[in-house]
């Protein structure tokens, strides 16, 4: 299995994004013999955000061992039995802290139920039941100004929109050339206007936020990519509105994993290129 470093944003775009603390330790008095894996992430109808963090449950949820544990991770369609293998991806937080993310770019059947399964070399497994939402139509870019980084997006969704963000790949420019590319992500869920018939509308004005993210020392910059990231979900999406932060971090509070801990949600996601991408300078 290959080691591939991927952006954590693909996981964080949805779900509590690693609701359980990365350094959370299980209670040594708690019986964990029946718990095999912790699993957090999303499975996407359109295959653009299907990434799930899968870690063997040991003393801690994450470890310092970059070697593969020979886990097999796959998705099974409950009606047809069709199976899709997820590929592994080693993610390094920094120092010697490693986690395993598993991803797939396969399109899936909307409004269908699946089982997300992680199995270790001894045959023990953890399973999450997932209900996928309807397909998410691609929204329309009604207008966009690259000068002000402002625009209007409109669309329609059968299921509630649970995440909407703009993402920019930006390079500061100095007198001798360009600095390394930076990723800037701005959430707009609070700005989203939704209607009873499923239509939605989003207006953004991001120039000042991009400048603030770059810092006062950056006077000039180029934007190589501008993207709209939008995600919908149905009954699978957890309701955290009545939970306090401490409750969210407890493994048994938000959990749909049998034989393990965690939460894997079904979503429909789209990544829309707002303007034509260009190569870094």
Regions found by a protein language model. Name each.
Residues 13-16, 275:
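Processing junctions and N-termini across compartments
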Residues 1-11:
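Bacterial N-terminal signal peptides that target proteins for export
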Residues 23-281:
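A sequence/structural signal for flexible, mid-protein segments enriched
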